[in-house]
Amino acid sequence: MPPKPLFPNVFPGDGAPRKRRLALALLAVPGLVPAVSYAQLSGAAAQPQPLDSPWDLRLAPQLEDRPLKDGAKPAAFVIADHTSGTAEQDLAAKGSAELRRGDVVVKADAIHYDQDTDMADAYGQVRINNSGTSFAGPEAHLKIEANQGFMTAPKYHFNMTGGSGSAERVDMVDNERSVFVNGTYTACQCSTNPAWYIKGSRFDFDTGADEGTARNGVLFFQGVPIFASPWMTFPLSGERRSGLLPPTFAMNSSNGFELSLPYYFNIAPNRDLTLTPRIISRRGVMTEATFRYLSPSYSGTFTANYLPDDRLAHRNRYAIYWQHQQNFGGGFGGYVYYNKVSDTTYPEDLGSTNQFVNGTQTLYQQEAGLTYNNGPWSVLARYQHWQTLPPSIAPYSREPQLNVKYTKYNVGGFDFGAEADYSRFRITTADATEGDRIVFNPYIAYGVYGPGYFVVPKVQYHFASYDLNYLSSTTPNSPKRFTESIPTVSFDTGLIFDRSVRLFGQDFIQTLEPRLYYVYTPYRDQSNAPLFDSAESDFGLAEIYQPNTFVGNDRIADANRITAGLTSRFIDPRTGDERARFVIAQQYYFADQRVTLNSGQSAVQARHSDLIVGAALKLGSGFMSETAFQYNQNNNQLVKSSVGFGYSPGERRVINVGYRYTRSNTTLDNQPINQFLISAQWPLTRRLYAIGRFNYDLAGDRVVDGLVGLQYDADCWALGVGVQRAANGINSSGQQNSSTRVMMQLTLKGLSTVDNGLVSAFRAGVPGYTPLPPPPPPMSRFSNYE
């Protein structure tokens, strides 16, 4: 018996107009569409349907799939210029043929569909779309509902993720999995000549798992192979997936050429590990591991660097960083912060290779603690230790510390509270005083607040008890056990006036806010107390209204002074935004301050403090300015100044200019500062951005630090290059050493993103820096509806 012709010319509607093809095809094979056939034959079914009918149109925030009910079979729809077949058995269609069933759409010049086996054979300009994945090729054979079959010479596109490519053959395993033989893959959206692509002998794609695997894969960029691997995995979208990340490069003046090859392990949705072998040409191979974890009750990061047998230092080098936060519930918590390096020159030699260590860092905190916070109570119990590198002086460690705070507000108009602290201070420096200290600091205040004024009297008390188990040889006759009791009374008051003004054609609300702050603390001899945690407080607008000129609990300054200040603000009445602020303040002394930090210092003899002046402006078009001055009227000298300007008219457009000046002071043993700083991020073209930072020491006639970089943002890739000169350690004379490094970072959009320190350097060096934008999100599968 001769084979049955595939497209017999027996259908009477061959010459029907195009708009009638669908109806003719459905009438010819009614068994394929029982729901529609029943609607045509039954009068009741032809009546208007209720609102829950699946055929009704309704408003929806977004297009969504409507799955079939359990046991229901999707109907099959066929459109073609010519169709023929047997009811409920098979169908042949040719001429712009289309077959639709469920989520599957098949288009071709000719289609044969066997309903018994659910097998479709398509020939000539075949296009298959299934759940957002599109295939195009000359021939395909597919089981529609199971989505199992193959296509020759396919071109494919994942609408949900944006990936695409071609191959010699594709085998469709199910709705989510497919296997390509001798193919390519790219996430570039261009139709021809993608900037990057992966070529492999086999690709296994799983859109459900959002993962692709390439066998014998070679990564090409601009037609040049840059990486090869017998096996590589990569995400099909921006979601995290295990696999190789793009290599990163750097050049350092002390370490030579650096090449990093990171591999990312997506252990779980809330845990991941990045393992990075780093080849350092002059030193060897360093391995870095970064483990991150997150849960509703805890989170943290652990990073370790290890360099065996450093070829320059001739020893093993390592650095450890661990940060952990824990929530036990009920207000209880805990934390760990541990940072350690192997030796004193690690920051100078290898700080540029570690984002948690910089070249000038000399103090490494090692601390663990328990916390409790509930209402007015706040409790901290911790063990704190420091690793100190020269030339820094080791600070005291708290081994351990227990701190309890209680604070209540507006209890009958009163604010009151107390702080109790026990600390055992230890230090690694030889011949240094050590011991225990108990501190109790209660206070009570009564605030009266009105629409245009406030009055806040306050009484506080400082009690300290020392039990020293070792005395320094410089204080051999000091007592080991003693106590201190020091009261303090303060009175803070101010007025607030406002008026409407019009300046430069714009309406403002101007305020005038005079403020007086008086504090009295009697003199108590504190020369026996060691300096466990106390130091001179900075002097500025943030500190001028504080009762104590020292920080810490070992020194409470005697005081009989008043601070007078005046603030004026200009506020936009439409938005409430503060557009300008001007401040001037000064302290006036009724008695000399006799308490000093060290016994060898002389008492402060002055009638008034330096004058503090500050201003902040926020003008239109992104212009901002902040300025502060500290002026000594007795010597007619500028003690400190800080001037800063910022201009940011749009995204990735920012310019910062600053100047800092500090006059040297032999009493405070501080070094003079006279520095000029400029930093910027600005587009040179639509795709090319320049980044720069220049910090110049006018007094020393040297560059403190500098950064010059370029970033190019293409459609599916980005390239950044930067040259950075930064401080890298401190020499024996106390001066900073500098080193230069070159960094290059290539980002293949849609494949993976990793920062080798370039973006971090740009962000740290340029306030207001904005990274390049991410690639646009892939379109919904409904955007390319077939």
UniProtKB/Swiss-Prot annotation:
Signal peptide location: 1-39
GO terms for cellular component: cell outer membrane; transporter complex
Region (Disordered): 767-786
The keyword ATP-binding appears for this protein: no
Predominant localisation class: membrane
UniProt-annotated location(s): Cell outer membrane
Stored Pfam families: LptD
UniProt-listed GO biological process terms: Gram-negative-bacterium-type cell outer membrane assembly; lipopolysaccharide transport
HAMAP family: LPS_assembly_LptD (MF_01411)
Family: Belongs to the LptD family.
The protein, known as: LPS-assembly protein LptD
Organism: Burkholderia lata (strain ATCC 17760 / DSM 23089 / LMG 22485 / NCIMB 9086 / R18194 / 383)
Protein encoded by which gene: lptD
